[in-house]
UniProtKB/Swiss-Prot annotation:
CDD domains reported in the protein's UniProt record: HATPase_MutL-MLH-PMS-like, MutL_Trans_MutL
Keyword Hydrolase: no
GO molecular function, one term: ATP-dependent DNA damage sensor activity
Record keywords, A-Z: DNA damage, DNA repair
UniProt-listed Gene3D superfamilies: 3.30.230.10, Histidine kinase-like ATPase, C-terminal domain, MutL, C-terminal domain, dimerisation subdomain, MutL, C-terminal domain, regulatory subdomain
Protein name: DNA mismatch repair protein MutL
Pfam families reported in the protein's UniProt record: DNA_mis_repair, HATPase_c_3, MutL_C
HAMAP family assigned: DNA_mis_repair
Basic and acidic residues: bias regions: 114-130
UniProt xrefs under PANTHER family: DNA MISMATCH REPAIR PROTEIN MLH, PMS, MUTL, DNA MISMATCH REPAIR PROTEIN MLH1
Similarity field: Belongs to the DNA mismatch repair MutL/HexB family.
Function: This protein is involved in the repair of mismatches in DNA. It is required for dam-dependent methyl-directed DNA mismatch repair. May act as a 'molecular matchmaker', a protein that promotes the formation of a stable complex between two or more DNA-binding proteins in an ATP-dependent manner without itself being part of a final effector complex.
Length: 658
């Protein structure tokens, strides 16, 4: 066996480069982070050949002292930390002193820098790990680093690179993340000499729109919440904006882009009730916390981190997002800037347990209780009142033809409302009788009567319900409603499904079980062996869901009681679906974790079906329930429950004013 020998510095640098510089995007990240740490307010990036042929980064930062310029290309040489205590409280983007040395060992690197009090710049070159002597050069205050012919001396590594287009895409994505994390810095990018983008110093709100897109901005909810020394802010997309890709998911911890399973798990748990199928949410989240509360020295790329109190982080992220999403109802969506209520006003809502270190990338499959945290402080990251800006209208110009004034529209609505109130007493009484007989009303209570007629005076905007009044039922599927200045279409099954689901969740949380209603005559049905086994194993669990079944022998089961609020649902289909869910889930712990999924299945059975004719009182009762139900903008599967056509959009359809 050969004798042990110390490796030469050049080989050590190339080994380190294998960890730090996997591709051009990693080299770009290291260089740009140095510019950020230097206090630059403008950073210009040029890429040739996807960053393989050339990466050039210029900044207007503080520059490097002429006596230190050679030292900057040595391993473990840095100005950012000096003691172990500095490492535990690191606030800079870089601190390891490996980035430039690693890049210099696998490229032809040129470093030119000038400080404000210097008469000229100083330049040094490195090739194959060998440094040239510093020379004077012309350069404004700041630093320019050029890394040419990446991996020219390690052909095996270069073979693993993808096409120039692919490598460029990784570089552009990396630069966008850095620009998003530092909106106060101006960024520009050129590709093969052609400008790609130029971002001025902006507010966070403007930078999110520039990087993530205006479509995300108009479909997002602003959040700004805190808990002790932790602060969470940014924007999350409404569930209807969810996509099948994860390209619009950004997590930043102390302005550093990270891939953290704790934060990602909390986000997924917050969205679990409102996402459809395999769709994923879009979000831009910033978490600020003391540097000593997070360890960024886990991996050389610094995208993996470790929180000192991961449970507190999980709580803050989950409860903040859950609160924001719960408020998306009846066109009353606002940003969550009332942070003091976030961790205390969510009754009975608990996230799933955090993933362990060995968890896989699929983080959907767990749920458990967490204690609530302390009442947090309130700050708004966007410098506004916290209100979400209304979605801008992009259709036709304002109509020029005569239309009803707002006062005339209200008067017309009042006339309708008064007629509706006087002529529908019989319908209301019939619907009450129907509810008593079948229990199939979307709401548990009829519309409350008021002593003040709706036509007494012109109502103000605040007196009109957000979803307006029902006008008619379309095709046995949709409810047509008129609001203050718009026409609404409501999917009655999807809406009733969400209302029933939230009611059942609330009843389970308050009482520990669903109230059941015994059937006068039990309903029997033929069951499979798996369904019979599920009944034998989980009879007590079924009782908690308001279902009472008994085994009659011969693979025959009898349904003796069903949840009271599900009315005249198909009890056999309901029982078979719930038994099927229990048979698939397995252990009692997993059943508890999948409770909401079982409730969602049950609510679907108890909701009004397409084709059923509703009376006006029933339709209006459903609208009022929607206005008071969390997450009522989406059904349990993430589909929208209603859409709005404004007066301007209706005018545009008929070319009014064009």
């Amino acid at each position: 066996m050969p004798r042990i020998a110390a490796l030469p510095d050049h080989l050590v640098n190339q080994i380190a480069a294998g960890e730090v510089v996997e591709r051009p995007a990693n080299a770009l990240k290291e260089i740009v982070e140095n510019s950020i740490d230097a206090g630059a307010t403008a950073i210009d990036v040029e890429l040739d050949g996807g960053g393989i042929r050339l990466i050039r980064v210029s900044d207007n930062g503080s520059g490097i002292h002429p006596d230190d310029i050679e030292l900057a290309l040595h391993r473990h040489a840095t100005s950012k930390i000096k003691t172990l205590n500095d490492l535990e409280h690191v606030a800079s983007m870089g601190f390891r002193g490996e980035g430039l040395a690693s890049i210099a060992s696998v490229s032809r690197l040129t470093l030119t820098s000038r400080q404000e009090d210097s008469s000229h710049a100083t330049q040094v070159k490195a090739e194959d790990g060998k440094l040239s002597s510093p020379t004077a050069a012309a350069h404004p205050v700041g630093t320019t680093i050029e890394a040419a012919e990446l991996f020219f001396n390690t052909p095996a590594r270069r073979k693993f690179l993808k096409s120039e287009n692919t490598e460029y895409a990784h570089c552009a994505t990396m630069l966008e993340r850095l620009a998003l994390a530092h909106p106060h810095i101006a960024f520009s990018l050129k590709r093969d000499g052609k400008p790609v983008f130029k971002l001025p110093a902006q507010s966070l709100h403007e930078r999110i729109a520039a990087i993530v897109g205006d479509d995300f901005q108009t479909a997002s909810l602003e959040i700004d919440s805190g808990n002790g020394a932790l602060r969470l802010y940014g924007a999350i997309a409404k569930p209807t904006f969810a996509k099948g890709k994860t390209d619009k998911q950004y997590c930043f911890v102390n302005h550093r882009f990270v891939r953290d399973k704790v934060m990602l798990h909390a986000v997924k748990q917050a969205y679990r009730d409102v996402l459809h199928n395999a769709l994923t949410p879009a979000f831009v989240l910033f978490l600020d916390l003391p540097p000593e509360a997070v360890d960024v020295n886990v991996h050389p790329t610094k995208t993996e981190i470790r929180f000192r109190d991961s449970r507190q982080v999980h709580q803050l992220v989950f409860h903040t997002l859950n609160k924001a999403l719960a408020d998306t109802r009846a066109d009353l969506t606002e940003s969550v800037s009332n942070a003091g209520e976030v961790l205390h006003d969510i009754t009975g809502v608990t996230p799933a347990p955090m993933p362990s270190e060995n968890d896989s990338e699929n983080l959907f499959d767990s749920a458990s209780d967490y204690p609530t945290g302390n009442k947090p402080d309130t700050r708004n990251a966007f410098g506004s009142s916290g209100k979400t800006a209304p979605m801008p209208y992009q259709a036709a110009r304002a109509p020029q033809q005569h239309s009803l004034s707002l006062r005339e529209s209200r008067a017309a609505m009042n006339t309708y409302a008064e007629l509706y109130k006087k002529t529908d007493d019989i319908d209301l009484e019939l619907s009450r009788l129907e509810q008593a007989r079948f229990g199939n009303m979307p709401s548990e209570t009829p519309i409350p009567k008021t002593d003040t007629p709706l036509s007494d005076g012109i109502p103000s905007q605040s007196e009109l319900p957000p979803l307006g009044f029902a006008i008619a039922q379309l095709l046995g599927i949709y409810i047509l409603a008129q609001a203050e200045d718009s026409l609404l279409l409501i999917d009655m099954h999807a809406a009733a499904e969400r209302v029933n689901y939230e009611k059942m969740k609330r009843q389970r949380q308050e009482n520990g079980k669903l109230q059941s209603q015994r059937l006068l005559i039990p309903v029997t049905f033929a069951a499979s062996h798996e369904e019979c086994a599920a009944l034998a194993d989980y009879a007590e669990t079924l009782a908690g869901f308001g279902l009472e079944l008994s085994d009659m022998g011969g693979n025959t089961l009898a349904v003796r009681a069903v949840p009271a609020m599900l009315g005249k649902a198909d009890v056999v289909s309901l029982a078979k679906d719930v038994l099927g869910e229990l048979a698939q889930v397995g252990s009692s712990q997993t059943i508890e974790e999948h409770e909401n999924h079982i409730l969602a299945t049950m609510s679907c059975h108890g909701s009004v079906r397409a084709g059923r004719q509703l009376t006006l009182p029933e339709m209006n009762a459903l609208l009022r329930d929607m206005e008071n139900t969390p997450r009522s903008n989406q059904c349990n599967h993430g589909r929208p429950t209603w859409v709005k056509l404004t007066l301007k959009e209706l005018d545009a359809l008929f070319l009014r004013g064009q």
